[in-house]
Amino acid sequence: MAEWHKIIEDISKNNKFEDAAIVDYKTTKNVLAAIPNRTFAKINPGEVIPLITNHNILKPLIGQKFCIVYTNSLMDENTYAMELLTGYAPVSPIVIARTHTALIFLMGKPTTSRRDVYRTCRDHATRVRATGN
């Protein structure tokens, strides 16, 4: 879908963010669009399934790297987002937002606030949800 690549392009132009990817969670659970050669481009189906099925997950593996869950409301229909921190130095904020068909992964730089990452990821997810995807 061309819309996914447009979201990744918009994010990659912004200097506040380090990595971004969009992953299908309904059918194939594969990466649909991502910034090339980064952590989120390596996300595999085995890492996506625990995110959407296990509400009490504490240290998920994302792109073969451990992360620490800060808040988890990913499957909540009103919030549809999960906040994480990287489990390695330098610590960066990560937000995963859920649309009807995909998960939007967004990692900020270590100097970017969690609020900026959360707001940007939720805005993209809300826009996509409004179109029905």
Curated annotation (Swiss-Prot):
Keywords on record:
Actin-binding
Organism in which the protein naturally occurs: Monkeypox virus (strain Zaire-96-I-16)
User: Which Pfam families does its entry note?
Assistant: Profilin
Q: GO molecular-function annotation terms?
A: actin binding
Q: State the family named in the UniProt similarity comment for this chain.
A: Belongs to the profilin family.
- What lineage, starting at the top, does this entry show? Viruses, Varidnaviria, Bamfordvirae, Nucleocytoviricota, Pokkesviricetes
Q: What is this protein called?
A: Profilin
Which PROSITE patterns does the UniProt entry name for this protein? PROFILIN
| Role this protein plays | More likely to influence phosphoinositide metabolism than actin assembly.
